[in-house]
UniProtKB/Swiss-Prot annotation:
Annotated organism of origin: Drosophila melanogaster (Fruit fly)
GO CC term, one of those recorded: cytosolic ribosome
InterPro entries associated with the record: Ribosomal_uS11, Ribosomal_uS11_CS, Ribosomal_uS11_sf
Entry protein name: Small ribosomal subunit protein uS11A
Compositional bias per record (Basic residues), positions renumbered to this chain: 142-151
Source taxonomy: Eukaryota, Metazoa, Ecdysozoa, Arthropoda, Hexapoda
Gene label: RpS14a
Amino acid sequence: MAPRKAKVQKEEVQVQLGPQVRDGEIVFGVAHIYASFNDTFVHVTDLSGRETIARVTGGMKVKADRDEASPYAAMLAAQDVAEKCKTLGITALHIKLRATGGNKTKTPGPGAQSALRALARSSMKIGRIEDVTPIPSDSTRRKGGRRGRRL
């Protein structure tokens, strides 16, 4: 009879979703905040912008359609995103703020300010803040006709 072979114990590899970092090291992500007058999106990616880390909208946080773009819904969305980022090890964010743009309004919606404040207050460090609203050099004709929108 052949001698028994000793059982080899396999080492369990712990899988981490976030980046491999030391304690106290600052890891940056990019928060894309799109604030229109109908909804607010808070979308966090890695620095390249390819990998989505978390994406929450104002509409996911409130029941009524009229409240989707409200500052309160944007604040809840930003707090959710910050919580997810912390669990994955992201401690700091660069912010790219965007309004509708194009041939529509270039003003960010009501949720932009409160989303940014909520990210800052949830102990996330803020790096650069940039406005990435698409502004045309020469646009197509805006809706409303020759005489404009009549109220």
